[in-house]
């Protein structure tokens, strides 16, 4: 499998494009100068475009991906608020942007040419909205609102409009601060990392009824940790066996084993990583994890032990200033 890793560095306004080798080694393919502070990124489901959000002029840029994974800018469209997180629906027809400072979610159409257009809907009053996450059925969008201690739920209509789901929200404990999410590949469970208490919630999805239920909450930090909690990102391996969470204060990756059915997590260890790991990701084989240090100006590649989920450091690579986002593309 040929894979490419994209790393967004907003302080130097760059995207570094790396080829990921079979042994986890990275080779630099391209450095893209971006017209703005590039932060969130998402790869189109058909793998032909990369969408990136920029500041301080709030826009989304559409980059065409060639056969090697290199990028060429192909389009630009406005966004109603500073983009904190970008995602698409599973069919690649709509782009969702969450704006933490703007307290809003917007929906933008994606044309047949893969280029994002101007927004067609804006939902306001979502305090501290930190991400938008389409569920595996492509019917419900989850929007964690950190300042509200709840995840708002919306139905996705045929033309891209969002309307309040019949179960309008899922609440966390007070002060948890829900942030980013991941879904189990069996489509029955969702996981949300909470920024302010560095915990993770497990939610069960009932496909037949559409009802949701929180079934577990776990602390992601080592026993006795008494510093400020500041969790950031969450990802699950493609086979659904291991889940990881980053914390920026401790500069740690928390390692969880996932039960066979996806319903329960077990914290098994912690891996020191790059300073202030704002973003990380897992490759499409589930063998490698790439962590970005927002304060170290480096990324680090780890091998994932397929029996335990433990992380073995392989190599570090210098990138741009303040790296915040990592996306991994499988070319074949």
Curated annotation (Swiss-Prot):
Pathway in which this enzyme or protein is active: Carbohydrate degradation; pentose phosphate pathway; D-ribulose 5-phosphate from D-glucose 6-phosphate (oxidative stage): step 2/3
Entry's Gene Ontology molecular function annotations: 6-phosphogluconolactonase activity
Transmembrane annotation, as ranges: none
Xref: InterPro entries: 6-phosphogluconolactonase_YbhE, Cycloisomerase_2, Lactonase_7-beta_prop, N2O_reductase_N, WD40/YVTN_repeat-like_dom_sf
Catalytic activity: 6-phospho-D-glucono-1,5-lactone + H2O = 6-phospho-D-gluconate + H(+)
Family in the record: Belongs to the cycloisomerase 2 family.
Function: Catalyzes the hydrolysis of 6-phosphogluconolactone to 6-phosphogluconate.
Name of the protein this chain belongs to: 6-phosphogluconolactonase
């Amino acid at each position: 499998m040929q894979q490419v890793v994209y790393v967004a560095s907003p302080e130097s306004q760059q995207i570094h494009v790396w080829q990921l080798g079979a042994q986890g080694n990275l080779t630099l393919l391209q450095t893209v100068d971006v017209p703005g502070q590039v932060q969130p990124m998402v790869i189109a489901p058909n793998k032909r475009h990369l969408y990136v959000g920029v500041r301080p002029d709030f826009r989304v840029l559409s980059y065409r991906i060639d056969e090697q994974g290199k990028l060429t800018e192909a389009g630009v469209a406005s966004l109603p608020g500073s983009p904190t997180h970008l995602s698409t629906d599973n069919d690649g027809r709509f782009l969702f942007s969450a704006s933490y400072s703007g307290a809003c979610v917007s929906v933008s159409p994606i044309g047949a040419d893969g280029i994002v257009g101007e927004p067609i809907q804006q939902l306001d009053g979502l305090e501290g909205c930190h991400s938008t996450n389409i569920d595996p059925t492509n019917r419900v969008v989850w929007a964690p609102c950190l300042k509200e201690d709840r995840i708002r739920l919306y139905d996705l209509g045929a033309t891209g409009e969002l309307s309040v789901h019949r179960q309008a929200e899922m609440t966390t404990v007070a002060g948890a601060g829900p942030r980013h999410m991941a879904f189990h590949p069996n489509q029955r469970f969702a996981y949300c990392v909470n920024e302010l208490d560095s915990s993770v919630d497990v939610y069960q999805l009932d496909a037949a009824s559409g009802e949701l239920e929180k079934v577990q909450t776990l602390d992601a930090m080592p026993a006795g940790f008494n510093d400020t909690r500041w969790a950031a990102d969450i990802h699950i391996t493609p086979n659904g066996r291991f889940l990881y969470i980053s914390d920026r204060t401790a500069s740690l990756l928390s390692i969880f084993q996932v039960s066979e059915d996806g319903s329960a997590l077990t914290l098994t260890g912690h891996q020191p990583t790059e300073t202030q790991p704002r973003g990380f990701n897992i490759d499409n084989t589930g063998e490698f994890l790439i962590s970005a240090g927002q304060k170290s100006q480096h990324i680090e590649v780890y091998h994932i032990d397929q029996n335990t989920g433990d992380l073995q450091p392989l190599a570090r690579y210098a990138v741009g200033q303040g790296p915040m986002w990592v996306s991994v593309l499988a070319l074949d």
